[in-house]
From Swiss-Prot:
Monomer. Contains 3 disulfide bonds. It comes from the Eukaryota. This is Snake venom metalloproteinase Bfon25. Belongs to the venom metalloproteinase (M12B) family. P-I subfamily. It is found in: Secreted. Keywords: Calcium, Disulfide bond, Hemostasis impairing toxin, Hydrolase, Metal-binding, Metalloprotease, Protease, Secreted, Toxin, Zinc. The keyword Calcium applies. Expressed by the venom gland.
Amino acid sequence: TPEHQRYVELFIVVDHGM
């Protein structure tokens, strides 16, 4: 689902921020 993809992208951004 598109919503899941959005969460995945957000998680990646947070991971890179860490």
